[in-house]
Amino acid sequence: MFVTTAVAGITINLAISSLGFAALVRPIPAMNQTVATLERMLSATQKPAALNYSRLGIGGVRLGMSVEEAKRKLGKPQRDETKPAAPAIGGKIRTLSYSGLTVAAWEGKVYLISTTNPKFLTIDGVKVRDNSQKVVKTYGYGSQSVQGGVTRLTYSNDQKASNLILEIKGSRVQKIIVGPPLN
């Protein structure tokens, strides 16, 4: 028996006999470009490049910056609150809230920045509402996860202590987060 089928741009020829079976897998000629593109994307997502720690920032605020320096860059926040950190961590967490931007600091140093406001750009010029092609052109292919229609591209920094995370819905950036790894 000989069967031929096409799945996702690939032709599969399958020969079945009493001795066993043999399969020949080959791309459909018209789909060669798509297959090559998918292979490049797959290999790139398996090994995302590490970002230099100095590239982790939004709106002129960088990780490790003092709260006072962040306030000088951003101006007076709409809300400024300080709460005790979890007992296992200790210390205090201070959160500065602006229109579509949140800056969190532990013991006076910025450790988390997130935005949904296109006014605030990453250090490399990516902003909310940019298309995913700009993200990939700027940062390459990050580690990907999908949940509820939102694709999360994660780029670790070279010290593996913090990440740049871009949440994409459709083909547009919806949220940008710079901070510790998220679960």
Predicted regions and their residues:
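Bacterial N-terminal signal peptides
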Residues: 5-15
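A low-complexity, Ser/Thr/Gly/Pro-enriched, surface-exposed linker/loop concept
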Residues: 111, 117-120, 132
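A cross-family detector of function-defining hotspots
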Residues: 41, 46-47, 51, 55-57, ...
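Signal peptide processing junction and immediate N-terminal pro/mature segment
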Residues: 15-38
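Glycine-rich loop/hinge motif
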Residues: 124
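A generic structural signal for short
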Residues: 55, 120-121
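Bacterial Sec-dependent N-terminal signal peptides
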Residues: 1-3
